């Protein structure tokens, strides 16, 4: 009985002492991971919102940048648009339509081929 009692308390403090520093380090790690996660999250929000629609908070950041990009693009677009239309109105529209049709046909063929496989 004495041996069992001695082994129990001896075994008990050992895992306890080893567990203490682990929980301490894990706490510090969690704090680090949390701050890193927040930073990576905000960065991901910046990159993701421009390529795909993201939730409200991240959208607020890119809005001014998108607005500033659109402002200079609008007048230049307006200036080049009427010139292009007047010069190659029919030709450009026909070429675009033909190209689009070819692309859709290719995509349909590929998708149907994949489905058959």
UniProtKB/Swiss-Prot annotation:
Low complexity biased stretches: 7-26, 44-53
The record's keywords, sorted A to Z, are: Chromosome, Developmental protein, Differentiation, DNA-binding, Metal-binding, Nucleosome core, Nucleus, Phosphoprotein, Spermatogenesis, Zinc
Where, per the database record, does this protein carry Phosphoserine?
A: 112
> Where found?
Nucleus; Chromosome
Q: Where is this motif: Nuclear localization signal?
A: 90-98
Q: What cellular-component terms does GO give this entry? A: male germ cell nucleus; nucleosome; nucleus
Pfam families assigned = TP2
Binding sites annotated in the UniProt record for Zn(2+)? 12, 14, 16, 24, 32, 34, 38, 41
What family is this protein classified in? Answer: Belongs to the nuclear transition protein 2 family.
- The name this protein goes by in its record: Nuclear transition protein 2
Q: What organism does this protein naturally occur in?
A: Mus musculus (Mouse)
Q: What is the lineage of its organism?
A: Eukaryota, Metazoa, Chordata, Craniata, Vertebrata
